[in-house]
């Protein structure tokens, strides 16, 4: 089922991109 794999792939990408964006925003605020 390609729909389920693409769904989990989207969750994996979101779970890796979101923390990176939060860390980037926190670093910008510290600067």
Curated annotation (Swiss-Prot):
What the protein does?
A: Component of the cytochrome b6-f complex, which mediates electron transfer between photosystem II (PSII) and photosystem I (PSI), cyclic electron flow around PSI, and state transitions. PetL is important for photoautotrophic growth as well as for electron transfer efficiency and stability of the cytochrome b6-f complex.
What are the subcellular locations of this protein? Plastid, Chloroplast thylakoid membrane
Residue ranges spanning the membrane: these are 4-26
**UniProt KW Thylakoid keyword:** yes
Q: InterPro entries per the record?
A: Cyt_b6/f_cplx_su6 (IPR007802)
Membrane topology according to the record: Single-pass membrane protein
Assembly and binders: The 4 large subunits of the cytochrome b6-f complex are cytochrome b6, subunit IV (17 kDa polypeptide, PetD), cytochrome f and the Rieske protein, while the 4 small subunits are PetG, PetL, PetM and PetN. The complex functions as a dimer.
Name the UniProt record assigns to this protein: Cytochrome b6-f complex subunit 6
Q: Which GO terms describe its cellular component?
A: chloroplast thylakoid membrane; cytochrome b6f complex
Q: Does the keyword Transferase apply?
A: no
Q: Which family does it belong to?
A: Belongs to the PetL family.
Provide this UniProt record's keywords sorted from A to Z.
Chloroplast, Electron transport, Membrane, Photosynthesis, Plastid, Thylakoid, Transmembrane, Transmembrane helix, Transport
Native organism taxonomy = Eukaryota, Viridiplantae, Streptophyta, Embryophyta, Tracheophyta
């Amino acid at each position: 089922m390609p729909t389920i794999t693409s769904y989990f792939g989207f969750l994996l990408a979101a779970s890796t991109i979101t923390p990176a964006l939060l860390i980037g925003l926190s670093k910008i605020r510290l600067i």
